[in-house]
Amino acid sequence: MINRFSIEKVKGLEIIDSRGNPTIRVFVRTNDGVESFGDAPAGASKGTREAIEVRDENGLTVKRAVDIANYIIDPALHGIDVREQGIIDKILIDIDSTENKSKLGGNTIIATSIAALKTASKALGLEVFKYIAGPRLPKIPIPLLNIINGGLHAGNKLKIQEFIVLPIKFNTFKEAFFAAIEVYRNLKGLISERYGKIYTAVGDEGGFSPPLEETREALDLIYTSINNAGYQGKIYMGMDAAASDFYDPKKEKYIIDGKELNPNQLLEFYLDLAKEYPIVYLEDPFEENSFDMFGELQNKLNSTIVTGDDLYTTNIKYLKIGIEKRSTKGVIVKPNQVGTISETFEFTNLARRNSIKLVTSHRSGETEDNFIAEFAVGIESDFIKTGAPARGERTSKYNKLLEIENKFGLEYGGKYFYL
């Protein structure tokens, strides 16, 4: 039955992301004139099992994705109640009919799915996070700030993709976040002093990319910055290895720090680092099919949250394997990896039922939309990854979290987090 919540129009628009690459924004409007939008982010380091984007001209346009939104999705969703997220997403999945969303495009589908959710919350007069959370009162997640970039995110010789700080032992998100900013500023000063001011320019995610060659050089810089800022024992360290990117499948070796390491040698490498530094978070330490090696490392690093990103790609099929093998204590949550909000909810619900920590994440190619921050709060994610405290497409998410905490008085998850 047509009512004020019925979808009247779906419209696609080509915009750009934070790397200057084209992406798609989809608007969803109801019969009552309520409208919102969803943007499709894009990653630089991608798991092979992620939903496929529809792009043209070697990735230089998304005109076909826009046409799909305007001429296929628009009529398919016309008249559907915008509050029926499950029905909307099922229609998109059924029309696409591929396992990897390659017909309509994962980018087109996720932008539409996000737009529908945001429009529904707006039509009901609710904040997005409240619409997602329902009656429960969620907490603000702990931020994972990527402050030194390596791997595919940088032009230096570091193989580890992200070096992260986690401000945990604070009473509020604001206290935690601004403490992390102090560390970031200290790091900037150290880099300028040791390598020159030119290396304080920021990368895709707002982190620094000094001319480093080995993992310990980056960890030393961050550890020193934490101590200089006076937050030893309150701010911890983490890494996103993105190990698939430095794995040579022909040799079955990992090429890192000028060495070729087999999986067991790489495991010992991580164990040594965990003894030397306060590392409590380790993402994608092995290539994306190594469920057993993830599990072995997690078993030996019980106080560290080993986390799967490329391992799972926000896909329930692979999470079930990880649960069976006890591969990780944490999972990355990226809605665009799987393609719809409903599938993302299935993934996060299964993880929660198995006491696995949720790490909601941005992508390296982002827009200024702050949806992922509201989403992280709504699902009560334990952590949020959305870059360094720099660049507008990153700070928009942090500013939204500050606003939510201030306006609604939500408690900070780090206050109750035990290592």
Curated annotation (Swiss-Prot):
One of its GO terms (biological process) is glycolytic process. Mg(2+) binds at residues 240, 283, 309. GO terms for cellular component: cell surface; extracellular region; phosphopyruvate hydratase complex. Binds a second Mg(2+) ion via substrate during catalysis. (2R)-2-phosphoglycerate binds at residues 161, 334, 363-364, 385. Keywords: Cytoplasm, Glycolysis, Lyase, Magnesium, Metal-binding, Secreted. Its cofactor is Mg(2+). SMART domains: Enolase_C, Enolase_N. It holds the Pfam family Enolase_C. InterPro entries: Enolase, Enolase-like_C_sf, Enolase-like_N, Enolase_C, Enolase_CS, Enolase_N. It catalyses: (2R)-2-phosphoglycerate = phosphoenolpyruvate + H2O. It is found in: Cytoplasm; Secreted; Cell surface. Pathway: Carbohydrate degradation; glycolysis; pyruvate from D-glyceraldehyde 3-phosphate: step 4/5. It comes from the Archaea. One of its GO terms (molecular function) is phosphopyruvate hydratase activity. The active site is at 205 (proton donor), 334 (proton acceptor). Its EC number is 4.2.1.11. Catalyzes the reversible conversion of 2-phosphoglycerate (2-PG) into phosphoenolpyruvate (PEP). It is essential for the degradation of carbohydrates via glycolysis. Belongs to the enolase family. This is Enolase.
